[in-house]
């Protein structure tokens, strides 16, 4: 099974200078676990902020989420893979880098995201098809 078959095409973005509080609101409202952080300028790259980042880097340290910018704690650069990569390769990358999602990119454009749950769901679908 290929990344393009299981990727989620709905990507939620947040500005580099938005507060972590803004990110928390958006993530809770949309019931999502990560946001792509837009570059601060043309020389910067996309990043990602996750529930895990917020809990461990802000809430767990009792920092003020209204004073910290998402760009300060975003992971950069995004881990990007080709849309035709096998999900087995993606899962080994996730294990190697201890990450829960990879982004499907093409010519600096983000096409989608594959998270751990997507791989699990893809595995179920493949088994149901007799694969």
Give the location of each predicted region:
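Short, surface-exposed, polar/charged, turn-prone segments marking secondary-structure boundaries
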Residues: 19, 41-43, 63-67, 75-77, ...
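A glycine-centered beta-loop-beta connector
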Residues: 27, 35-51, 94, 102-117
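Tandem CBS (Bateman) regulatory domains
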Residues: 1-10, 48-79, 86-95, 113-131
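The conserved cystathionine-beta-synthase
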Residues: 14-32, 38-39, 80-98, 105-106, ...
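Short N-terminal leader segment in a subset of presequences, especially plant chloroplast
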Residues: 8-17, 43
